[in-house]
């Protein structure tokens, strides 16, 4: 019997990415962008922000981080690419935003489960 080389971390990351996509509150047409909020913008979140412009049909509309200094720095840095970006310090407010279609949870591990549950409920 062979063992899979899938680590717990990779499994959880893939699962969280799939579950974090919110159900759309509007019908998306063929030309509609997916509006994304990135929660946690220090390291992994910054990497996601740098790569979203390479994905057609994806637009970052909001960023969230508990550290207001990092939040302001990232928002200023990436508004040149994405246009106006709303800033949040509480991820619960992001989940309530009506124009966010998907969220990226680039947060510490202990926030993954609760953040994913809130995203699915939104």
Predicted feature residues:
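N-terminal glycine-/serine-/threonine-rich beta1-alpha1-beta2 phosphate-ribose binding loop
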Residues: 1-122
């Amino acid at each position: 019997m062979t063992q899979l080389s899938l680590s717990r971390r990779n499994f959880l990351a893939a699962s969280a990415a799939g579950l974090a996509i919110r159900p759309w509150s509007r019908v998306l047409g063929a030309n509609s962008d997916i509006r994304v909020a990135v929660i946690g913008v220090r390291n992994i979140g910054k990497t996601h922000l740098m790569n979203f412009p390479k994905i057609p049909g994806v637009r970052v509309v909001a960023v969230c981080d508990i550290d207001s200094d990092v939040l302001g720095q990232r928002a200023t840095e990436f508004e040149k690419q994405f246009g106006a970006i709303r800033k949040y310090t509480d991820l619960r407010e992001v989940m309530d935003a009506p124009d966010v279609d998907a969220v990226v949870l680039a947060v510490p591990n202990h926030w993954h489960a609760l953040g994913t549950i809130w995203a699915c409920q939104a």
